[in-house]
């Protein structure tokens, strides 16, 4: 596994006592007693005013948290004291506001959901490639470059000449591999994601499928943007992030995008001028896919968020992680209904 990484603030980020540190972290490690860690970890986060969501599973830990630097340091130190959780890979960036409204520690079957049994990055994984060596690798004409992220993430930025698998969720990635990649034809495959975790599992999956030369970007896109100068970059656009910032630019500053809470796709200011855009309810991509029941529920949630903002309060309905979970549950419910027909 890669060692812990502390993402330095850019010159444009002036840190003060009120600056919020955003920390993305993960580690694949066997956690036999992960259920017992849930309550003490949640209590520790709450005690130091750290918000966000952490996922615990038998295969490890994953998530993004935010709060004062002292709080983040306290949580990381607490995790480091737990069996197997020392040297957690983490990256830090900074914001003037906390992008999360709640503190959550959830128990899961997987810390990143592929839905394939037996894939263990601790046993087999692709070759890590440092950000400084990434450009040379993906410039090799024999290398097939695959973006393992979801379609709404790729919409606003990707590496030059990368393949978009057109997946809505990471669960669809194995099916993409089965239909589009051939171990006898594609001798070199390179993959990347936001912070590195999906690539740990996707490269492990390809190795299990018999692909020999499999590479992935160590530390993900965020580490690449931190270390590779914009004058040398092969990254095009902005990088989607799973918090209230929606996206960051090459300087790791908050980008120019908002997000449709209905379909999760990023939106520009111009796109928000569409007649189909209703804040918190729909946009030009999904207006004809949102049911009346959903439209009514989304509108009420947005009304509650607006009322909370007027009172100077935060509302959990505006938390990106909460919205993602809501959409995922809706999809699962829909699939369950179709399966029962």
Curated annotation (Swiss-Prot):
Q: What is its EC number?
A: 1.14.-.-
| A GO MF term | oxidoreductase activity, acting on paired donors, with incorporation or reduction of molecular oxygen
- Active-site residues (renumbered): 193
Q: Which stretches does the entry tag as region Disordered?
A: 306-341
User: Which enzyme class, named as a word?
Assistant: oxidoreductase
Pfam family of the protein (one): UPF0176_N
The UniProt similarity line reads: Belongs to the TrhO family.
- What name is this protein filed under? tRNA uridine(34) hydroxylase
Q: Which organism is it from?
A: Colwellia psychrerythraea (strain 34H / ATCC BAA-681)
State which gene encodes it. trhO
